[in-house]
């Protein structure tokens, strides 16, 4: 009978399936002998908590997971401290900057110097006045002869001598060639740091030609030791003045090409205008000099205000900026190169004949021809290069308008043949002290533009 009932049930299911639109309903067979038991709800809830028998202390406990989502915490944002250099290619030497950044904004910029310190001022105290001269080539190793000129003027002031006119004109001539060397390096490496490579390659070819002038007049491409106390070491070789004239005539065309690339370039203007602004008051308070001072609108040039050698006999203009930003300083350097070409042309036209050293055997060595015939000349030569010449006791501060600014030498003599003290005032030292002020509030990438516009060389900063 049971099998018959099951068979009838399956027939009913088949009929429901075959009927269109009919849903399948399986018959529910209640289990025999099973009685469902429903407990008391309150009694059952005591087993649903975190503990089986909760007390007052454990009643608020929750079953796991206790913390599906961490509660939000107070976010603490700290400024990042970043080391810029001393291996950075845009550091222009061994500059190390400890910078505090808020995102990419510079909040603090602390320069750390001294990584190129060689004890130059102390070493000079153990050398004669002539032996100390090559140390000045290694200070600002981009504008070599200007450093020599400052030291030579200081020694000549203590000795109370004045070099011959031809020597002074040669000094001014090569001082302006050195200014061209420095400004080419400053402008093109500044552009290279900001991504413009072409000016660097174009103008370094011209720089090599000026190194050739150095080599022809002194035998060395960079560290010349050419300008010495009492005059210059050698006279100009034949044909050199003609070559310098030809170079200066063509170099103005190179400057035109430089300005075509940069002056109205949209990217260059965006990266330099209103970047690193220094007001005239701030420039004076920080002790800026040179282009860093003139770019802020102060017309101060030692070649005009306190002329040395024959700068009072040449005509040139002093370019001055108005905004005090990186762009104004770039324009000042380009215009200074044009004014240097004017001075070079005047030096070539006004170059007088005559001696190139002071006519005093106690200071300048005698000529080779005299040494072969005169015993006194041989003795003077020997004593000059072994003991050196005695400088009367006294002290002097002598400053010149170097390409980077006011380069000063404070020289103290005790009457011996060696300096008692030689303090060197480097323009880049004061400029680097203003880096924090100039870069505060700018982006990290703008710090590179500010370092480039300061024209820093660490030979003179660290000494």
From Swiss-Prot:
Task: Give the transit peptide range.
Answer: 1-33
As stated in the Swiss-Prot or TrEMBL entry, residues carrying the post-translational modification N6-acetyllysine are: 62
Post-translation: what modifications?
A: Dimethylation at Arg-118 by NDUFAF7 takes place after NDUFS2 assembles into the complex I, leading to stabilize the early intermediate complex.
Q: Give the reactions, separated by semicolons, that this protein catalyses.
A: a ubiquinone + NADH + 5 H(+)(in) = a ubiquinol + NAD(+) + 4 H(+)(out)
Query: Sites of the modification Symmetric dimethylarginine?
Result: 118
As for family, the record states: Belongs to the complex I 49 kDa subunit family.
Can you state the subunit structure given in the record?
Answer: Core subunit of respiratory chain NADH dehydrogenase (Complex I) which is composed of 45 different subunits. Component of the iron-sulfur (IP) fragment of the enzyme. Interacts with NDUFAF3. Interacts with NDUFAF7. Interacts with CERS2.
**Name of the molecule in the record:** NADH dehydrogenase [ubiquinone] iron-sulfur protein 2, mitochondrial
From what organism does this protein derive? Gorilla gorilla gorilla
